[in-house]
């Protein structure tokens, strides 16, 4: 949409489902992001040349696969490749297998087993719901009772849906986001940013989908950026190719220095 006014090649922009804030720049389409067959038909009927997918949910549900099968161009990974975002357990195991730097972890689908494991570790600890949770599936309990409550939410009460929990080592340091355009093993980095996920001032409160972000990030040096690109982002792209699920789209790395 940003280049629409300056590009003669862009004639029409549709947004599904859209909202009042975007209506001045695009024609809003009354289709939900999860209505994949209907979105395919809409793209066919309206001669849409390129579809760009933002949310993770339709990607994990296979919207890119459906569009590709229909002969439609789409920017976004296949459902198999989208597991790098939709399953923290998949991502952690991939990094472990291909020696990509990551915090130590263990995955559980049983509440009692998770509780027993957590009880033997020092706090804080990091608990991550395996699936998609709109940026709210990570909890950092400071005490055992907090961990019990969070694990109950995730494994017994299915707060985010039926799934597993990744129990991860707690690390400290500046967090940053590194996004890259990826096409198989081709990796093209964007500028590093730092977003703020906690709901309240002073990095307090529960995690959100994001309260704000800024770029560049002074604490991340050129050497940090080069290391991250070579040892994490490029290695991850190569690992996905090796696993026969090459990533095509925008790969997001949530990292810590």
Task: List each language-model region with its residue ranges.
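Glycine-rich phosphate-binding loop signature in dinucleotide/nucleotide-binding domains
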Residues: 43-48, 120-121, 161
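Short, charged, surface-exposed secondary-structure boundary motifs
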Residues: 24-25, 40, 83-89, 200-202
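ATP-binding N-terminal substructure of ATP-dependent carboxylate-amine bond-forming enzymes
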Residues: 1-79, 112
């Amino acid at each position: 949409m940003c280049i629409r006014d300056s590009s003669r090649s862009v004639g029409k922009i549709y947004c599904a489902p859209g909202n009042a804030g975007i209506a001045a720049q695009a024609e809003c389409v009354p289709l939900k992001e999860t209505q994949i067959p209907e979105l395919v038909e809409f793209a066919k009927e309206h001669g849409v040349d390129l579809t760009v997918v933002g949310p993770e949910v339709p990607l994990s549900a296979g919207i890119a696969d459906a569009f590709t099968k229909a002969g439609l161009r789409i920017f976004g990974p296949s459902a198999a490749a989208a597991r790098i975002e939709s399953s923290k357990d998949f991502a952690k195991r991939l990094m472990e297998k291909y020696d990509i730097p990551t915090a130590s972890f263990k995955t559980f689908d049983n509440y009692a087993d998770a509780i027993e494991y957590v009880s033997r570790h020092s706090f804080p600890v990091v608990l991550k719901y395996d699936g998609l949770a709109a940026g709210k599936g990570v909890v950092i309990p400071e005490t055992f009772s907090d961990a019990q409550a969070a694990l109950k939410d995730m494994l017994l009460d299915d707060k985010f849906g039926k799934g597993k929990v990744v129990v991860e080592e707690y690390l400290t340091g500046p967090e940053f986001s590194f996004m890259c355009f990826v096409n198989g093993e081709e990796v093209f980095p964007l500028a590093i940013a730092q977003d703020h996920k906690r709901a309240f001032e002073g990095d307090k409160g529960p995690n959100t989908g994001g309260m704000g972000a800024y770029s560049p990030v002074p604490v991340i040096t050129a050497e940090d950026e080069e290391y991250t690109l070579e040892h994490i982002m490029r290695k991850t792209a190569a690992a996905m190719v090796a696993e026969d699920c090459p990533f095509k789209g925008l790969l997001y790395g949530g990292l810590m220095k």
